[in-house]
Every structure is written in structure tokens, then in C-alpha cells.
A protein has these predicted regions:
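A basic, amphipathic helix-loop patch mediating RNA/tRNA/ribosome contacts
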Residues: 7-53
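C-terminal structural segments of small proteins and small subunits
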Residues: 44-73
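Small beta-barrel nucleic-acid-binding modules, principally OB-folds
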Residues: 1, 12-15, 64, 72
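Low-complexity, intrinsically disordered short peptide segments enriched in small/polar/basic residues
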Residues: 2, 18, 34, 61-63
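N-terminal beta-hairpin/loop module of FHA
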Residues: 1-7
Length: 73
């Protein structure tokens, strides 16, 4: 799936909610704590990690490609 952002970055837990992977922040926290989320192939351990355009986030078999909308920051 492709998620477009118009800001410089989005925090990992916010991205998971925005993409519909989780319903709320506590679910995102659990997924990250259980090491179920990777960013660019590395296990993510910080729910506030800054995700930028070009990053690839994976949760199980779901892959999220983060892109920039082209609008200015």
C-alpha cells in the first residue's frame, strides 16, 4: 500500500493508525513492543520514530510505502 504525506515526516505510531493497520495508539504500541514492525528492513522499537518519504514499513505481510504528496512542507 502507498501512503502519501505532505509533511517532512510522520511518527511510526501515527502512520500505523493513518494506514488503518491499527485502530488506536495502544495497538500500535503493542505491535512495536512485540517487534512486529520493521522500517527499511530493520525491526522498529520506537513508536515515535520519524518515518519519511521513501521509507518502507512492514507489519506482517502488509507493506507500506511512504511517499511525498509533492506539496510543500
Amino acid at each position: 500500500m502507498e501512503i502519501k504525506i505532505s509533511t517532512e515526516y510522520i511518527k511510526l505510531d501515527q502512520l500505523l493508525k493513518f494506514a488503518g493497520v491499527v485502530g488506536n495508539g495502544s495497538d500500535a504500541k503493542i505491535l512495536i513492543f512485540e517487534e512486529e514492525v520493521s522500517v527499511n528492513g530493520e525491526i522498529a522499537t520506537q513508536r515515535g520514530k520519524k518515518i519519511r518519504p521513501g521509507d518502507v514499513v512492514q507489519v506482517g505481510d502488509q507493506v507500506i510505502n511512504v511517499c511525498w504528496t509533492g506539496l510543500s512542507f
